[in-house]
């Protein structure tokens, strides 16, 4: 109904979980797996280890909410502690979904200090809270670099540049470096936020979520 439309929510996740003789692996990406998006630039992260179980649990919640049978997924989850494939590393992975994505982005930006650098590549950027956090980080002496899609095209149709042109104007007015992807009909479809501190430590947030409300 029209009354339900304001609460409409699509499943925007792009997740692949596979298994082989070495165990389970996961891919989280910004890419839509269809030919209409084949020219778009995207990003993805492939990983193993306990985080695969966290990802499966988040997908199981969606299945349960939809009334689907979760028996097969439950069996996979029960075997993951022994079967999850991981690479020995000091890196850590955390799976975040829904509003936790905004909270994590806000934390990454908000805790950046003078001498740190924030690199943001985003298909859609318009969330007021995050725009304010970016401007405040710049004022604290954080180097902020932003790469945006110009929002000119979508599947062969011309667009008006909303929302990125308005956001870029605001950020540029605050003194933040904003650059446009050099697209020719395709989309700069990546969604990533990278923070590097003065010691070379890095914190990366990526996936399918745009920074919009």
Protein language model features and the residues they cover:
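PLD/PLD-like phosphodiesterase catalytic module centered on the HKD motif
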Residues: 1-23, 35-40, 46-53, 57-64, ...
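Active-site cores of enzymes that catalyze phosphoryl transfer or operate on phosphate-rich substrates
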Residues: 47-50, 61-104
């Amino acid at each position: 109904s029209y009354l339900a439309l304001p609460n409409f929510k699509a499943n925007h996740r792009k997740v692949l979980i596979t298994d082989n003789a070495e165990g389970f692996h996961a891919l989280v990406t910004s890419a839509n797996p269809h030919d209409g998006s084949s020219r778009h630039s995207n990003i993805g992260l492939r990983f193993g280890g306990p985080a695969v179980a966290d990802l499966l649990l988040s997908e199981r919640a969606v299945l349960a909410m939809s009334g689907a049978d979760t028996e097969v997924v439950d069996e996979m989850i029960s075997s993951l502690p022994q079967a999850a494939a991981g690479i020995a590393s000091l890196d850590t992975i955390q799976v975040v979904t829904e509003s936790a994505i905004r909270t994590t982005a806000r934390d990454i930006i908000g805790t950046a200090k003078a001498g740190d650098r924030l690199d943001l590549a985003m298909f859609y950027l318009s969330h007021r809270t995050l725009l304010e956090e970016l401007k405040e980080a710049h004022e604290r002496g954080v180097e902020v670099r932003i790469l945006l899609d110009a929002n000119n095209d979508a599947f062969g149709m011309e667009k008006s540049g909303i929302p990125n042109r308005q956001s870029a104007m605001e950020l540029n007015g605050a003194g933040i470096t904003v650059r446009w992807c050099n697209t020719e009909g395709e989309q700069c479809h990546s969604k990533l936020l990278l923070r590097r501190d003065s010691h070379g430590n890095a914190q990366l947030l990526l996936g399918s979520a745009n920074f919009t409300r």
